[in-house]
Amino acid sequence: MYPNLYYAFRDLVGVEWKFLRFVNSFGFFVAIAFIVAAMVLTAELRRKSKQGYFQPTEMQMMVGQPASLSDILLNFLLGFLLGYKIVALFILDNSATEDPQAFIFSSLGSWPAGIAMGLLFAGLKWYEKNKQKLSKPEKRTVRIWPHDRVGEITIIALVFGLAGAKLFDIFENWSDFLKRPADYIFSAKGLTFYGGLICAALAIWWYAKKHKIGFWHLNDALAPTMMLAYSMGRIGCQVSGDGDWGIENPRPNPYSWLPDWVWSYNYPHNVNEVGVPIPGCTDDKFCTQLPVPVYPTPLYEVIFCFLLFLVLWFLRKKLKVPGYIFAIYLMLNGMERFLIEKIRVNNPLDILGFHPTQAEVISSLLFLSGLGLFLWLRQKAKTAKPAEPLKNN
């Protein structure tokens, strides 16, 4: 396992760059997942725009204005934070940056680097605005298509997704949270997928309504994108060993063609530092492995969800009713997660004598919601007048 990129580069390339301790493997793959998802979503929204499913919105903006004081101060602040914390990882003593997460949330940093980066960012903003300055600023009308807003959609999904994932993890582990609330809030660990999905979905719904983006067509474009992003994000879970593994599986591998680490795995050097000491490990951290191998469920989800992405990607041009792809996504997502929960470690709930996990409850609701939505959309399509196109919002 590689808790962060420092250990990955040390093992794979043979270099020891201390600043790479700052980049968690899980966070790295989540970032890659968001970037790839944004690219796929842009391509799909552009395709739908060419087919006439989306229309642009117009907005007026002032051009040719010089940089305002708020522009300069905001960029100075961003540059200062980057220099004070991130650049400091390169130049401060190793003892100060040995634990990157603790360092980021501490008051430690480099004032000279912060001020220098702040001045650089502020200067670049002033130069950029001054270069575009007109003798007389003017108001122009611009047309913005949905695919032009993918950057904003991605940021909204990231912010609300992470917040929702953290909140749902806190609810799922409420007793542990009460014992050490600060650790839970500021830790990079502990993220619940469905919490992120629900909160991000609500935020994107509000954004689409605000900017008059066809809701069902947007969801159809998001469906394969989210499945692909989830698959790629689970690579981070597997590589870092963040605790999202399965139940114990001490049985020997019965399949000669299947690698042993696919059948069961003990997650050495896992980021949660769970398990027993690894013989011969001399690192200060991440020197544990599980005493009994478990099902590597993140790896299974990487494979299964990528296959489901291919299914959705194939169907997106075959199904013409707006919302069908999204409904199928809900059903496939719910089914996949419900099945994987059977071999996953989770805290069970107590509901009327039954003990499902939070993910099993939500995945069941997702499947039923997807099924109900599909049937409703099909009935709506049947009763729609032939000359009247089905509304997409």
Segment roles from a protein language model:
Residues 1-393:
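Hydrophobic, membrane-interfacing alpha helices
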